[in-house]
């Protein structure tokens, strides 16, 4: 099992509330994920606040732009010292290669760089509406292969896709899976979901888990229970 596979997704519009939650968690059991809303609201200072508390951070901004712009964006993320950041694979091979090249000067200190394939909220019908006339899983495989060709570290994918992607792309290619819900949790707006043990067994390396931990009466107890279920 990957060391610290749990990535706690933070989703707050109040920084103090976010830090109060973070202070209840254990950096030895999880890493944290910050997305577009929180980074737009609170900026790089939030990243520094998280690092000061001993947590690794996945800066989930899903960059998608021309290659030069994305290269500069991932460089900025590296300067912040984040553990992982990401781009949209649909930005294309040249964009992903430019992003990867931009991180070379950081050597072993470079953040992991992964790509988003198909958002877990997207159904086959949703894909058809944007001109992609193949099933979601087929499109995921196509984008994941392109990501590996660009020499990125892995992809975000649904847990249902993990087993085939591992066999297709190899054990060293990391799979980060949202849509993870412990037994009894509300599936929310995620269409493709699994429990944490199911996802790891399927080949996922990192599990993105938000509300089952952040909205729990006792967030640390919820984190500990999920962590224990994976041991």
Swiss-Prot record:
Catalyses: orotidine 5'-phosphate + H(+) = UMP + CO2
The entry's cellular-component GO terms read: cytosol
Q: Which residues bind substrate?
A: 11, 33, 60-69, 120, 181, 190, 210-211
Question: Organism's domain of life?
Answer: Bacteria
Pathway listed for it?
A: Pyrimidine metabolism; UMP biosynthesis via de novo pathway; UMP from orotate: step 2/2
Molecular function GO terms recorded: orotidine-5'-phosphate decarboxylase activity
**Record EC number:** 4.1.1.23
Family annotation (InterPro entries) = Aldolase_TIM, OMPdecase, OMPdecase_AS, OMPdecase_bac, OMPdeCOase_dom, RibuloseP-bd_barrel
Signal sequence coordinates? none
Q: Does the keyword Lyase apply?
A: yes
Read off the Pfam families from this record: OMPdecase (PF00215)
Entry annotation: catalytic residues: 62
Q: Name one GO biological process term.
A: 'de novo' pyrimidine nucleobase biosynthetic process
The enzyme class is lyase
The record's keywords, sorted A to Z, are: Decarboxylase, Lyase, Pyrimidine biosynthesis
Q: Which family does it belong to?
A: Belongs to the OMP decarboxylase family. Type 1 subfamily.
Question: What does the subunit section of this Swiss-Prot or TrEMBL entry state?
Answer: Homodimer.
Role according to the record: Catalyzes the decarboxylation of orotidine 5'-monophosphate (OMP) to uridine 5'-monophosphate (UMP).
Spell out the protein name for this chain: Orotidine 5'-phosphate decarboxylase
Q: Which organism is it from?
A: Shewanella oneidensis (strain ATCC 700550 / JCM 31522 / CIP 106686 / LMG 19005 / NCIMB 14063 / MR-1)
Gene name linked to the record: pyrF
């Amino acid at each position: 099992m990957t060391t610290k596979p749990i990535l706690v997704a933070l989703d707050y519009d109040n920084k103090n509330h976010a830090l109060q939650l973070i202070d209840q968690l254990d950096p030895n059991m999880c890493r944290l994920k910050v997305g577009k809303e929180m980074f737009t609201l609170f900026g790089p200072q939030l990243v520094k606040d998280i690092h000061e508390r001993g947590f690794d951070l996945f800066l989930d901004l899903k960059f998608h732009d021309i290659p030069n712009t994305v290269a500069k964006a991932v460089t900025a993320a590296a300067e912040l010292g984040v553990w992982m950041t990401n781009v949209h694979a649909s930005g294309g091979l040249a964009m992903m290669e430019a992003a990867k090249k931009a991180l070379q000067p950081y050597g072993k200190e470079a953040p992991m760089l992964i790509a988003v394939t198909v958002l877990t909220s997207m159904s086959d019908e949703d894909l058809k509406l944007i001109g992609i006339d193949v099933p979601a899983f087929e499109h995921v495989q196509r984008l994941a292969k392109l990501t590996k060709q660009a020499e990125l570290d892995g992809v975000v994918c649904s847990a249902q896709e993990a087993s085939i992607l591992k066999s297709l792309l190899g054990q060293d290619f990391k799979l980060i899976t949202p849509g993870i819900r412990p037994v009894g949790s509300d599936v929310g707006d995620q269409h493709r979901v699994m429990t944490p043990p199911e996802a790891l067994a399927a080949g996922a390396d990192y599990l993105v888990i938000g509300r089952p931990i952040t909205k729990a009466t006792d967030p640390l107890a919820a984190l500990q229970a999920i962590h224990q279920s994976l041991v």
